[in-house]
UniProtKB/Swiss-Prot annotation:
GO biological process: translation
Superkingdom classification of source: Bacteria
Keyword hit for Protein biosynthesis: no
One GO MF term attached to the UniProt entry: structural constituent of ribosome
The organism's taxonomic lineage, starting at the top: Bacteria, Pseudomonadati, Pseudomonadota, Betaproteobacteria, Neisseriales
Keywords (A to Z) from UniProt: Ribonucleoprotein, Ribosomal protein
Family matches, as PANTHER family: 30S RIBOSOMAL PROTEIN S2 PROKARYOTIC AND ORGANELLAR, SMALL RIBOSOMAL SUBUNIT PROTEIN US2M
This protein's record includes keyword Ribonucleoprotein: yes
Pfam families: Ribosomal_S2
Gene assigned in the entry: rpsB
Protein name: Small ribosomal subunit protein uS2
C-alpha cells in the first residue's frame, strides 16, 4: 500500500513557504509560484510530484535491500531525522557531519570499532580495574562518539542513497556523496541551489512540521519497499511449494 502525501498535507505543514525574496537563488525560479509579503511561495504543483517520485525511488531501493542514510543536523531537524530513520531501520546523522564520513569511511569504521570497544569496557566496569575518574572520562568519550557516530554504527558499508534536509546546511555531505556517485534526495528551499541534487524536493526546510512530513514520507517509502520485497519472497516460496 502506498502512503504518498497529499497537497493538503503539504499546505498544512507550510511546505510552500520559502525564504525572504532578497535571499533567493535564481536557480530555484522554476519551482517558485510567486511571493507574498516579501516571502517566496513555492509551487506545490511542482513539489508534490517530485516528492512522490523521490518516494518511489526509495521504495524500489528498499525493495532491493538498499540503504538510505538520513541526514539532518540543523536544530529543527535533529530529533525528527533520528526518530524517522530509527522507525524504518536506516542509518542517520543528526549531530554534526564529520568530514570524510563517506569519502573516508574506512577511518570512520575504525572510530565505530573504538566506540564499541569502549562501551564494552563500561558495561563490564566492575571487572576492568579502572578507577572512578577513568570510568568517568571513558563515559564522556563514549557519549561524544555516540553523538557523532551512533546513527551509523550498524551500517555495513556506504549507503546507496542519501536523504538530506536543507541542502545548503549539508553542503559537505552532498560534496562527498557526489564524489562517490551516491544519489542525493534533497529538500531545497528558495535560498539554495538545486544543482547536483538527483531528486530535488523544493520546499520549506525550516518548519519542523514540513521536516516531519518529508522524513515521515521517506521512512514510509522504506517500510513499504521492504514489505513489498517480503511479499514477493513469500509468494515465490508458496509457488515453489505448490509445484
Amino acid at each position: 500500500m502506498s502512503t504518498n502525501v497529499t497537497m493538503r498535507q503539504m499546505l498544512e505543514a507550510g511546505v510552500h513557504f520559502g525564504h525572504q525574496t532578497r535571499f533567493w537563488n535564481p536557480k530555484m525560479a522554476k519551482y517558485i509560484f510567486g511571493s507574498r509579503n516579501k516571502i517566496h511561495i513555492i509551487n506545490l504543483e511542482k513539489t508534490l510530484p517530485l516528492f512522490v517520485e523521490a518516494q518511489e525511488y526509495v521504495r524500489r531501493l528498499a525493495a532491493n535491500k538498499g540503504t538510505v542514510m538520513f541526514v539532518g543536523t540543523k536544530r529543527q531537524a535533529r530529533e525528527i531525522v533520528r526518530e524517522e530513520a530509527a522507525r524504518c531501520g536506516m542509518p542517520f546523522v543528526d549531530h554534526r557531519w564529520l568530514g570524510g564520513m563517506l569519502t573516508n569511511y574506512k577511518t570512520v569504521k575504525q572510530s565505530i570499532k573504538r566506540l564499541e570497544e569502549k562501551r564494552a569496557i563500561l558495561e563490564g566496569a566492575g571487572e576492568t580495574g579502572y578507577n572512578k575518574k577513568e570510568l568517568l572520562d571513558l563515559q564522556r568519550e563514549v557519549e561524544k562518539l555516540e553523538r557523532s557516530l551512533g546513527g551509523i554504527k550498524d551500517m555495513k558499508g556506504l549507503p546507496d542513497a542519501i536523504f538530506v534536509i536543507d541542502t545548503g546546511y549539508q553542503k559537505g555531505t552532498i560534496v562527498e556523496a557526489k564524489k562517490l556517485g551516491i544519489p542525493v534526495i534533497g529538500v531545497v528551499d528558495t535560498n539554495n541551489s538545486p544543482d547536483g541534487i538527483d531528486y530535488v524536493v523544493p520546499g520549506n526546510d525550516d518548519s519542523s512540521r514540513a521536516i516531519r512530513l518529508y522524513a515521515r514520507g521517506i521512512a514510509d517509502a522504506v517500510l513499504e519497499g521492504r514489505a513489498h520485497s517480503l511479499q514477493e519472497i513469500v509468494a515465490a516460496a508458496e509457488t515453489a511449494q505448490a509445484e
